[in-house]
Amino acid sequence: MSLTQTPLLQDLGIQNATLHHNPGVDELYAAALRRGEGKQAATGPLVVHTDKTGRSPKDRFIVEDDLTRDTVWWGGFNTPISPVVFDRLLDKMTHYAEGRELFVQDVFAGTDPQYRIAVRVITEMAYHSLFVRNMFVRPTAEELEHFQPDWTVLNIPSFKADPERDGVRSETFILVNFTRKMILVGGTQYAGENKKGIFGVLNYLLPQRGVMPMHCSANMGEDGDVALFFGLSGTGKTTLSADPSRRLIGDDEHGWTDTGVFNFEGGCYAKVIHLNPEAEPAIYRTTQTYGTVLENVVLKPDGTPDLNDGSLTENTRSAYPITQIDNIVPEGRGGHPKNIVFLTADAFGVLPPLSRLTPEQTMYQFISGFTAKIPGTEQGVTEPQPTFSTCFGAPFMPRHPGEYARLLAQKVRESGANVWLVNTGWTGGQYGEGQRMSIQHTRTLINAALSGQLDNVKFEREPFFGLEIPTEVPGVPKEVLNPREAWADKAAYDRTARKLARMFRENFKRFEDGVDPAITASMPEHREA
């Protein structure tokens, strides 16, 4: 169906383009191969290599106007631009797009009809259109007949900005305009910008409607009990939420309403570097399936994907519809969470493997969003480096973290959900001295928490962070439960714990003006021994 005469494209100013409206998988494969965008692996997936191999958070801008001036938390990842800059780049992009071949997908962001937004994504690359089709919620044929977009994404990677003339940082740009309900993307082929751009939009819009947007995975037990898993990269979020005894609601983005949780997406965008087919069989199968997009995966001479080759990037990805996973909740919705798990990989080795959080600690840990990077090969880096990403997703959160924390605390109070902090990092010493937390112990602890096994267990409070630790969990040695007991040198543990507590306090200073005093009162400095 041609879109050349629709009001939308007239509004955009794109003339004489060859448009493919809601093309299917076969058509998009054919177009991507014809245009030289990628290759089809012998096992079926479309394999593409991109100029940028990750997101460009420093090139993301939000239009500052009357709507956003006092509602966006400016600074950090939220950089303002003027409406004039946006309009000028939009004009240049639409003229650049004239006469080109473009692909249009009409999709929903959100599985809950009450809160979803309708999104029209116009892309220069066929593979981006397949990515969008895989990742978002696909409307029914009837819904497509009456589709009216709330938001428009225009993504033209070959259009590169002139930083000096166009008022942006580099040739790459991601511009979000909440007043005009548009996202412009240029100068990058990385498909994740389509997904995370709309995630940021939902993270801005939904709190106004009392919905908590979350960067987390979600699954459901046999009895319908829902669990959420928050965690930064490398904490085990994907592995630990992929439980054969629980059905997957979604792996990355969710909203929490007055009735329960819903997935923002209709697909998954999984990291696949060194993916183990025995440890992650469901995700591995998707990397061998027709319809999947494999991003920056290297092909072997026989045309099969080499998931162990990170020569292009360690950030190799598989984008596939969630329906390719067998053990899912097909409607992408569930009730109120019974348990919430914050995952952290503490390379300092001082946080407990599992602790129970109070409502105030929940807000504090959520705003902090802590994990730690291990020392690399960089000269002079000999100790773990703390990483704080507020709300476990700082690049995607336009509002003040205090807003999200208050909303989460309200939802936790109303639902009575248990909140757990789980350390998947080090024990018995920091990185280089201790050992990585046993995945079996972590699974045992999480299963005990989700099953209600810990409801009647005695807890003790550790002195440095005020965290409540279970004194006994079947299958986990007692000396593992209390991190101080796992260290041979108790004085070294105390020094390291105080050091990490100071890092938490220092990081939290930038949030204190926008959070409740009760959160500040739960800070480690009030517990320091």
Swiss-Prot record:
Subcellular location: Cytoplasm
Binding-site residues, substrate: R55, Y190, K196, R317
Pathway noted in the entry: Carbohydrate biosynthesis; gluconeogenesis
GO (cellular component) term, any one: cytosol
Name by which UniProt lists this protein: Phosphoenolpyruvate carboxykinase (ATP)
MF GO annotations: ATP binding; metal ion binding; phosphoenolpyruvate carboxykinase (ATP) activity
Keywords annotated in UniProt: ATP-binding, Cytoplasm, Decarboxylase, Gluconeogenesis, Lyase, Manganese, Metal-binding, Nucleotide-binding
Designated gene of the protein: pckA
Protein family per UniProt: Belongs to the phosphoenolpyruvate carboxykinase (ATP) family.
Binding site for ATP: K196, H215, G231, L232, S233, G234, T235, G236, K237, T238, T239, E280, R317, T442
Organism: Deinococcus geothermalis (strain DSM 11300 / CIP 105573 / AG-3a)
Residues annotated for Mn(2+) binding in this entry: K196, H215, D252
Chemical reaction(s) catalysed: oxaloacetate + ATP = phosphoenolpyruvate + ADP + CO2
